[in-house]
């Protein structure tokens, strides 16, 4: 039997095809100059669940199912009376994905989740931060196959931030296009 370790599909594609395409397109002289994915951060704001801790727990459970690892609950830093918010209350959840889990999530996002979004026309190609990172938002988390539609109590939105080692937005956009991100502009 072969003792071959599992490697995510997109990681193999990056190693075998994308690196060469990026090197050719931008004329890098050193292999270490070629941009790569650094991490993907998933953030879910659950402000409506402040009063109900059960809703917060279901949101954390859903994010764990989507990401494949346990999320960190983000807490309020200070009290705001107008929002009935006290310091230390859970107001969101976040997960940072790296290495193989990052590539697996990206594969599910591009091939399964984005095509399932209602009225999806493509991603905004101008949502880069100037340092090679891309941020996008989803209005509902139901587009992921890990979520059972029948057992959902509430629909949550989420932010997805893709961090790369690219030095410019142009390099980062070229990298994400190679990963089949459906940019409109």
From Swiss-Prot:
GO aspect biological process, one term: translation
Any matching Pfam family: Ribosomal_L5_C
Keyword terms of this UniProt record: Ribonucleoprotein, Ribosomal protein, RNA-binding, rRNA-binding, tRNA-binding
Keyword set includes DNA damage: no
InterPro entries to which the protein is assigned, alphabetical: Ribosomal_uL5 (IPR002132), Ribosomal_uL5_bac-type (IPR020930), Ribosomal_uL5_C (IPR031309), Ribosomal_uL5_CS (IPR020929), Ribosomal_uL5_dom_sf (IPR022803), Ribosomal_uL5_N (IPR031310)
GO MF term set: rRNA binding; structural constituent of ribosome; tRNA binding
GO cellular component, one term: ribosome
UniProt xrefs under Gene3D superfamilies: 3.30.1440.10
Matches recorded under HAMAP family: Ribosomal_uL5_B
Function description: This is one of the proteins that bind and probably mediate the attachment of the 5S RNA into the large ribosomal subunit, where it forms part of the central protuberance. In the 70S ribosome it contacts protein S13 of the 30S subunit (bridge B1b), connecting the 2 subunits; this bridge is implicated in subunit movement. Contacts the P site tRNA; the 5S rRNA and some of its associated proteins might help stabilize positioning of ribosome-bound tRNAs.
Quaternary structure and partners: Part of the 50S ribosomal subunit; part of the 5S rRNA/L5/L18/L25 subcomplex. Contacts the 5S rRNA and the P site tRNA. Forms a bridge to the 30S subunit in the 70S ribosome.
Family: Belongs to the universal ribosomal protein uL5 family.
Protein name: Large ribosomal subunit protein uL5
Designated gene of the protein: rplE
């Amino acid at each position: 039997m072969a003792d071959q370790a599992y490697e995510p599909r997109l990681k193999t594609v990056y190693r075998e095809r994308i690196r060469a395409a990026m090197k050719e397109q931008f004329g890098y002289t050193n292999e270490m100059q070629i941009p790569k994915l650094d991490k993907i951060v998933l953030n879910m704001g659950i402000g409506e669940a402040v009063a109900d801790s059960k809703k917060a727990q279901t949101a954390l459970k859903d994010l764990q199912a989507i990401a494949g690892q346990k999320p960190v609950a983000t807490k309020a830093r200070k009290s705001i009376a107008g929002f009935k918010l006290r310091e230390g209350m859970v107001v969101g959840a976040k997960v940072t994905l790296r290495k193989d889990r990052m590539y697996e999530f990206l594969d599910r996002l591009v091939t399964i989740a984005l095509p399932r979004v209602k009225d999806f026309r493509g991603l905004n190609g101008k949502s880069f931060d100037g340092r090679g990172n891309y941020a996008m938002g989803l209005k509902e988390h139901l587009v992921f196959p890990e979520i059972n539609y029948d057992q959902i109590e509430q629909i949550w939105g989420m932010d997805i931030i893709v961090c790369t080692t690219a030095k410019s937005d142009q390099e980062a956009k070229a990298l994400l296009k190679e990963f089949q991100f459906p940019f409109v502009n």
